[in-house]
Swiss-Prot record:
This is Serine--tRNA ligase. Consists of two distinct domains, a catalytic core and a N-terminal extension that is involved in tRNA binding. It comes from Thermotoga sp. (strain RQ2). GO terms for cellular component: cytoplasm. L-serine binds at T233, A234, E235, E287, S387. It is found in: Cytoplasm. Its EC number is 6.1.1.11. Pathway: Aminoacyl-tRNA biosynthesis; selenocysteinyl-tRNA(Sec) biosynthesis; L-seryl-tRNA(Sec) from L-serine and tRNA(Sec): step 1/1. CDD domains: SerRS_core (cd00770). The gene is serS. It comes from the Bacteria. It holds the Pfam family tRNA-synt_2b.
Length: 425
C-alpha cells in the first residue's frame, strides 16, 4: 500500500508512475474524490459532536436554573443531532472502506533506477554467468528424460490431481530433496540466514499484507470452510511475520530463509509452458526474505540477488540476471531482478528466481515499523524477497544441462554428498 499522503500531495507523480507500469491512473482521481468526501464527513461529524456536547452542558445548566421548557427544546435538538451523527458515522465508515479498498488496488511506485518499458521484451540484461553448453548430440527435454527412466510420471499425477502436477520416484525424488537441503545449508551456513518453518495455510489478513489480496484472489487456492489460503510462496508468512510489531534498528536487517511447497492456480497462464515441470500448480521453493531499513534496502537487494546467484554458481548452471522494466514489475515491487537459468529444451533463459525490493509497501499494510537508533522515531521497515531458488526448475536445469550421450545425467559435484549417487538413473 502506498502512502495516502503521497497521493494527496503529489497526485501527478503517482499517476505518471502508474502510466509507466501500464496501469490506468484514473483510480488516483477516484481515490482523491473519496478521500476529500471522507475527510469532509469527519469534519462535519466532529462539528456536530461538539455542538451536541455543548447542548448537554446547557441542558444541565437550564434544568438547574428551572428553565425546563428551554431545556426540553435543546434535548430535542440533541436527539436530531444524534441521528445526523449516526448517519454521518455510517457514511464515514462506508467511505473509509471504499478508500482502503482502492488503496489496496494501487501497485507500488517503481524506483527511479528501474528501466521504463511496456513488457518483458524491454527488460534489461545486467550480467551473465557461464556459457550455455554446446552438445555434440541431440539433447532431450526433461519431460522426455524423466519418463524414459520411469522416474518422472505426469500421467499418474494427472490421474491423481489433474494437469500441471508431477509425481517423481527414486533418484529424482531424492534429487529434489537434496536440492532443498543444499540450498538451505548454503543460505544458513554461508549467508547468515535464519531458517524458519512456516504454516502453509494463512489467514486472509496475512495474504492481504503481502499484496496477493484483494487483486489476485483468483490465483490462489482457498480452503473456504476455514477461509484460509494455501501459500503461493513462503514470502507470504515470512514477510508478514512481524506484522503489528515495532522492531529496534539494531535488530535489522533480519534475514529469513524457508523451504515450502507453493500452490498457485495459474489462472492467467493457460497455454503457457504446458509441457513438463516449468509451470506447476504445486512446486517446491526456497525463499529468502529480508526485513531492513529504508536507507539500506536497495543495497540489500543487490546482496539478496548475489545470495541467490551463489546457488546457480555452485551448481555450475549458466544463467543471466535481468532488471525488470516498469511494465513487467510485479504488483508489490519497486524494483525486481529476475535470474534466468539456461534451459536447452527452450533454447532460452527461463526464470528461476525473482528478487524484489517492495520498500514499505507491505510494511504499511501490516503496520511493521522499527525504532530509529538516532532519534527514537518510528518508521516503516522495508521488506525484500527472492527465490533462493525454485527447486523444481533447478532440477529441470540439472537434467537438461548435465545429460550425457547415453541418456543418463551426471549429478553436480556439490550435490553428491546430499544424494549419495553421481549419476541418474
Amino acid at each position: 500500500m502506498i502512502d495516502i499522503k503521497l497521493i494527496r500531495q503529489n497526485p501527478d507523480f503517482v499517476k505518471e508512475a502508474l502510466r509507466k507500469r501500464g496501469e490506468d491512473p484514473a483510480v488516483i482521481d477516484e481515490i482523491l474524490k473519496i478521500d476529500a468526501d471522507w475527510r469532509a464527513t469527519i469534519t462535519k461529524t466532529n462539528e456536530l459532536r461538539s455542538r451536541r456536547n455543548e447542548i448537554s452542558k446547557n441542558v444541565a445548566r437550564l434544568k438547574k436554573e428551572g428553565k425546563n421548557a428551554e431545556a426540553e427544546a435543546l434535548i430535542e435538538e440533541g436527539k436530531r443531532l444524534g441521528e445526523e451523527i449516526k448517519a454521518l458515522e455510517e457514511k464515514e465508515k462506508e467511505l473509509q472502506e471504499k478508500l482502503n479498498y482502492l488503496l489496496l488496488m494501487v501497485p507500488n511506485i517503481p524506483h527511479e533506477s528501474v528501466p521504463v518499458g511496456e513488457d518483458e521484451s524491454q527488460n534489461v540484461e545486467v550480467r551473465r554467468w557461464g556459457e550455455p553448453r554446446e552438445f555434440d548430440f541431440t539433447p532431450l527435454a526433461h519431460w522426455d528424460l524423466g519418463p524414459a527412466w520411469g522416474l518422472m510420471d505426469f500421467s499418474r499425477a494427472s490421474k491423481l490431481s489433474g494437469s500441471r502436477f508431477t509425481v517423481m520416484y527414486g533418484k529424482l525424488a531424492r534429487l529434489e530433496r537434496a536440492l532443498i537441503n543444499f540450498m538451505l545449508d548454503v543460505h544458513t551456513k554461508e549467508h547468515g540466514y535464519t531458517e524458519v518453518w512456516v504454516p502453509h495455510l494463512v489467514k486472509r489478513e496475512t495474504i492481504t499484507i503481502t499484496g496477493q489480496l484483494p487483486k489476485f484472489e483468483e490465483e490462489l487456492y482457498l480452503a473456504e470452510r476455514d477461509d484460509l489460503f494455501l501459500i503461493p510462496t513462503a514470502e507470504v508468512p515470512l514477510a508478514a511475520l512481524h506484522s503489528g510489531e515495532i522492531l529496534e534498528e539494531k535488530e535489522l536487517p533480519k534475514k529469513y530463509v524457508a523451504y515450502t511447497p507453493c500452490y498457485r492456480r495459474e489462472a492467467g497462464s493457460y497455454g503457457k509452458d504446458v509441457r513438463g515441470m516449468i509451470r506447476q500448480h504445486q512446486f517446491d521453493k526456497v525463499e529468502l526474505v529480508w526485513v531492513t531499513t529504508p536507507k539500506r534496502s536497495f543495497e540489500d537487494l543487490e546482496q539478496l540477488v548475489k545470495d541467490a546467484e551463489t546457488i546457480l554458481q555452485k551448481l555450475e548452471l549458466p544463467y543471466r540476471v535481468v532488471s525488470l522494466c516498469t511494465g513487467d514489475l510485479g504488483f508489490t515491487s519497486a524494483k525486481t531482478y529476475d535470474i534466468e537459468v539456461w534451459l536447452p529444451s527452450y533454447n532460452a533463459y527461463k526464470e528461476i528466481s525473482s528478487c524484489s525490493n517492495v520498500t514499505d509497501f507491505q510494511a504499511r499494510r501490516g503496520n511493521m515499523r522499527y525504532r530509529r537508533r538516532s532519534d527514537g522515531k518510528l518508521e516503516y521497515v522495508h521488506t525484500l524477497n527472492g527465490s533462493g531458488i525454485a527447486v523444481g526448475r533447478a532440477l529441470v536445469a540439472i537434467l537438461e544441462n548435465y545429460q550425457q550421450p547415453d541418456g543418463s545425467v551426471r549429478v553436480p559435484e556439490v550435490l553428491v554428498p546430499y544424494t549419495g549417487f553421481e549419476v541418474i538413473p
